[in-house]
């Protein structure tokens, strides 16, 4: 059994799938505690559900949508997370897993057909000590790594990690936004990236700009 918050359909607001219709399976509980978390969860909101019931819900309500994102919370704290992914893939869905980067990934003994979108937490998150950097070495070129940047310290930290732990995964860079929806850093971030010739993708949270779930 898993605990979850909700299952809903919207557009993907982040990653290289930005703008595509997507079914989100939001699992409950995250052991990380980032300072900028935009999905705080209340224990009273959690609900139990089986892998089978999740699959039935997706097939009944969202069969037309072929993109599924397993998110949270932290999906990988559940032993049932990957069996759920395999079941959804067997039905023809394209699945991505959003993970904090603070839970060990499985060993890359074969080429995965699902995608990880993995965070690396910077200094402003307050939890960078929880990063498992070895996860970066387990990623494929179909995976993605996301950094949230508030200031120069976060940016320099990102550069250091990229140099020490080179990965074939795509690198996504997001400016951090304050509670009023204003970016802490804007053109400066772009200037730094261009000056340093970094092969990264700058992204923003499209769903927040469009004011959709």
Give residue ranges: language-model regions.
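A secondary-structure boundary/capping signal
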Residues: 26, 71-72, 205
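A broad, structure-centric signal for solvent-exposed, well-ordered loop/edge residues
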Residues: 11-14, 18, 34, 44, ...
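Residue-level signal for well-ordered alpha-helical segments
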Residues: 2-7, 11-14, 31, 35, ...
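Flexible, acidic/Gly-rich N-terminal and inter-domain linker regions that tether
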Residues: 1-24, 28, 32-41, 194-201, ...
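Conserved Radical SAM active-site core
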Residues: 2, 6-9, 21-22, 33-114
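Short, flexible coil/linker segments at or flanking structured domains
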Residues: 11-18, 42, 56-58, 83, ...
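Conserved AdoMet/S-adenosylmethionine-binding subsite of the radical SAM
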Residues: 77-213
């Amino acid at each position: 059994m898993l605990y979850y918050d909700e299952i809903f359909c919207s557009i993907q607001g982040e990653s290289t799938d930005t703008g595509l219709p997507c079914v989100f399976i939001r699992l409950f509980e995250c052991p990380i505690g980032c300072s900028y978390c935009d999905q705080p969860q209340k224990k009273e909101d959690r609900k139990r559900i089986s892998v089978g019931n999740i699959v039935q819900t997706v097939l009944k309500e969202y069969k037309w949508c072929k993109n599924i994102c397993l998110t949270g919370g932290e999906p990988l704290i559940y032993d049932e997370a990957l069996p759920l992914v395999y079941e959804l893939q067997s039905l023809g869905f394209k699945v991505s897993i959003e993970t904090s980067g603070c839970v060990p990934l499985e060993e890359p003994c074969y080429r995965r057909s699902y995608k990880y979108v993995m965070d690396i937490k910077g200094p402003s998150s307050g939890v960078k000590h929880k990063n498992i950097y070895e996860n970066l070495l387990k990623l494929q070129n179909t995976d993605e790594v996301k950094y949230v940047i508030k200031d120069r310290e976060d940016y320099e930290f990102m550069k250091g990690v990229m140099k020490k732990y080179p990965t074939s995964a795509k690198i996504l860079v997001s400016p951090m936004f304050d509670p009023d929806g204003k970016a802490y850093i804007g053109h400066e971030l772009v200037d730094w990236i261009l000056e340093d010739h970094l092969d990264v993708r700058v992204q923003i949270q499209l769903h927040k700009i469009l004011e959709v779930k």
